[in-house]
Amino acid sequence: MKDRVLLLGVLILLTACPIGAASVSAKGMEAFEGVCSRADEYGCYVNHRYGYALAWPKRMLRPLGESDAGDGQVFASPDGRAELRCWGSFNETPQQTIPEALAQALAEPGRQVTYRHAAKDFFVLSGYETDRIFYRRSILAHGVLATFELTYEMSLKELFDPVIRDISAGFIIDPAFGLR
């Protein structure tokens, strides 16, 4: 009986954490913990369904609650001048790549993209949408595509530029956070 329980436990661990995807890089976790350790500035949201985590500026934004689907959260400024959204999804087609996800994001209407950068496992877009600035970062890891997007009025650019760096540095996917 003990052998069966042990075997079942090993099978569950192997299924939940495939070899090569056991954890986020130490550098990524260190960056996340570094931002989240600044508790007077940042709150840390962890999405247990998709296993991603995001630091959010708690002096500027308030959480509005996780979506009914459990895929993400919205944080908004009390005056409505800024909003941070994050969401995740399982990569149901393992062939989907960052270039494909980037093309899909670029196809969204009404946006003027002024900056884009793509690498093997992430992309960044920023630009303008009507009278607002947007910054989107998507990461692909462990079979999950996670995205955050910060939008804010142009007059808030100086305030939010350093915040974007912190949010980006601490945005990670790690099976230790959930992946249900």
Predicted regions span which residues?
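Bacterial N-terminal signal peptides that target proteins for export
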Residues: 1-7
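Bacterial N-terminal signal peptides
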Residues: 8-18
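N-terminal low-complexity, Pro/Thr/Ser-rich intrinsically disordered segments
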Residues: 24-44
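Short, exposed beta-strand/loop patches in secreted or surface proteins that constitute
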Residues: 34-37, 45, 62-66, 111-117, ...
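Secretory pathway targeting signatures of secreted, lumenal, and periplasmic proteins
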Residues: 46-97, 125-128
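Extracytoplasmic/secreted envelope proteins and their assembly/folding machinery
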Residues: 57, 95, 99, 161-168
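Signature of long, low-cysteine stretches enriched in small and polar/charged residues
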Residues: 99-159, 178
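Short, low-complexity, Pro/Ser/Thr/Gly-rich segments in the mature regions of secreted, periplasmic
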Residues: 171-179
